[in-house]
């Protein structure tokens, strides 16, 4: 079939297999061209491995450090008449490249929040790796089913204390308007913590520890976005921010639980990037479009793969990591520089519908959004007839 993007609201409902492969190969080429840290991981578990920062972590581990990887994800396979999800095609492309390089890459498709998938992962680690020395936790989900009680928790993107009305870039209509978001109630705050907080990261690390599959000196990271004043009302100081604070609690608990292994758990603060998750958050399309304008002009912008390649080199495997006052790895320091934030704020305050293209780099934002789904990639023939049916090797 000929596959063109089908965009509904802030999501694209299909994906292009050839485009996704080209996008993954771009990231692999970037990592191969970099100078990696002298030390690095050998056996890596990536929980949330198919898109964004999780995929970038898997690529960096394999093609920067020749590490074996086990990837956990929950993706929709293709059929004869419907495309699979972007994450499905991304993983198929990654595994194909790893196979060609002769580097182990195994995959589990299922609900990472469940006991069943944790048990499957442990079984695979015992059989093929023995132990893992790096665990990357990079899940984004609107819901989580409690594996013990069966209760379904839901996350919300709401402010705390009082409702917020703020400027917004409506990507469907391509206009600057306002968005109003009601304040969360206590149940919504707790639900967001239960989904996006550190509980499942902790469950994973406890299960791995009890099974004896964590290596001496094991490292684990969970990814977060902190942001600054512009994004705090609906992000950093809102329900999702409370959930991210719970990651700090979990990091402390995991450090205590892995002390006998000299383990290290750190939350990692990363840049705002265009992902399937961030595109759903009010204010983020406008913020990121303005940030693109500033940081690309400065030559300092880093996407997922640049951020993660540098995270491994500058922080996870560095003797002098850059930490914030909470002990998190700070990989977002360029974005949060005062001079950058001031110029982004100036754009934010000035932009209207007529000046979107002049003042922001919404064009780049939209291009990045399409690339998530394999569209708009140089060298890909989007008029060609392609089969949507692509298999993932080494999938259980």
UniProtKB/Swiss-Prot annotation:
It comes from Colwellia psychrerythraea (strain 34H / ATCC BAA-681). The keyword Lipid biosynthesis applies. It catalyses: a 2,3-saturated acyl-[ACP] + NAD(+) = a (2E)-enoyl-[ACP] + NADH + H(+). NCBIfam families: EnoyACPredFabV, PRK13656.1. The record marks 75 as: Plays an important role in discriminating NADH against NADPH. The keyword Lipid biosynthesis applies. Involved in the final reduction of the elongation cycle of fatty acid synthesis (FAS II). Catalyzes the reduction of a carbon-carbon double bond in an enoyl moiety that is covalently linked to an acyl carrier protein (ACP). Pfam families: Eno-Rase_FAD_bd, Eno-Rase_NADH_b, Enoyl_reductase. Transmembrane segments: none annotated. GO terms for molecular function: enoyl-[acyl-carrier-protein] reductase (NADH) activity; NAD binding; trans-2-enoyl-CoA reductase (NADH) activity. Gene3D superfamilies: NAD(P)-binding Rossmann-like Domain. Monomer. GO terms for biological process: fatty acid biosynthetic process. The lineage of its organism: Bacteria, Pseudomonadati, Pseudomonadota, Gammaproteobacteria, Alteromonadales. InterPro entries: Eno_Rdtase_FAD-bd_dom, Enoyl-CoA_Rdtase_cat_dom, FabV-like_NADH_b, Trans-2-enoyl-CoA_reductase. The active site is at 235 (proton donor). Pathway: Lipid metabolism; fatty acid biosynthesis. Belongs to the TER reductase family. Its EC number is 1.3.1.9. Keywords: Fatty acid biosynthesis, Fatty acid metabolism, Lipid biosynthesis, Lipid metabolism, NAD, Oxidoreductase. NAD(+) binds at residues 48-53, 74-75, 111-112, 139-140, 244, 273-275. It is an enzyme of class 1 (oxidoreductase). Substrate binds at residue 225. This is Enoyl-[acyl-carrier-protein] reductase [NADH].
């Amino acid at each position: 079939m000929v596959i063109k993007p089908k965009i509904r609201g802030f999501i694209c409902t299909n994906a292009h297999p050839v485009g996704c492969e080209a996008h993954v190969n771009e990231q692999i080429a970037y990592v191969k061209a970099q100078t990696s840290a002298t030390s690095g991981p050998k056996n890596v578990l990536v929980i949330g491995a198919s898109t964004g920062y999780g995929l970038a972590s898997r690529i960096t581990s394999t093609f920067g450090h020749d590490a074996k990887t086990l990837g956990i994800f929950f993706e929709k396979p293709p059929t004869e008449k419907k495309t699979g999800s972007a994450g499905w095609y991304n993983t198929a492309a990654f595994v194909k490249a790893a196979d060609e390089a002769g580097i182990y890459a195994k995959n589990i498709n299922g609900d990472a929040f469940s006991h069943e998938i944790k048990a499957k992962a442990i079984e695979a680690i015992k059989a093929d790796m023995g132990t893992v020395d790096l665990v990357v936790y990079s899940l984004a989900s609107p819901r989580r089913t409690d594996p013990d009680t069966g209760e379904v928790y839901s996350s919300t993107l709401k402010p705390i204390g009082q409702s917020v009305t703020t400027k917004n870039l409506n990507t469907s209509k391509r206009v600057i308007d306002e968005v109003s978001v009601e304040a969360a109630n206590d149940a919504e705050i707790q639900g967001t913590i239960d989904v996006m907080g550190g509980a499942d990261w902790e469950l994973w690390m406890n299960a791995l520890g009890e099974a004896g599959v964590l290596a001496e000196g094991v490292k684990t990271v969970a990814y977060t976005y902190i942001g600054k004043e512009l994004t705090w009302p609906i992000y950093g100081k809102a329900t999702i921010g409370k959930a991210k604070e719970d990651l700090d609690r979990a990091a402390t608990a995991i450090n205590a639980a892995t002390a006998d292994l000299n383990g290290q758990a750190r939350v990692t603060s990363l840049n705002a990037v265009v992902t399937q998750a961030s595109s759903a958050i009010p204010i983020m399309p406008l913020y990121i479009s303005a940030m693109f304008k500033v940081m690309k002009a400065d030559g300092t912008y880093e996407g997922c793969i640049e951020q993660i390649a540098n995270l491994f080199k500058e922080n996870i495997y560095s003797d002098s990591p850059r930490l914030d006052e909470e002990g998190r790895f700070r990989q977002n320091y360029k974005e949060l520089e005062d001079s950058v934030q001031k110029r982004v704020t100036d754009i934010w305050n000035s932009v209207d519908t007529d000046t979107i293209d002049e003042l922001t780099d919404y064009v780049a934002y939209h291009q990045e959004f399409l690339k998530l789904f394999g569209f708009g990639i140089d060298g890909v023939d989007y008029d060609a007839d392609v089969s949507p049916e692509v298999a993932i090797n080494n999938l259980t």
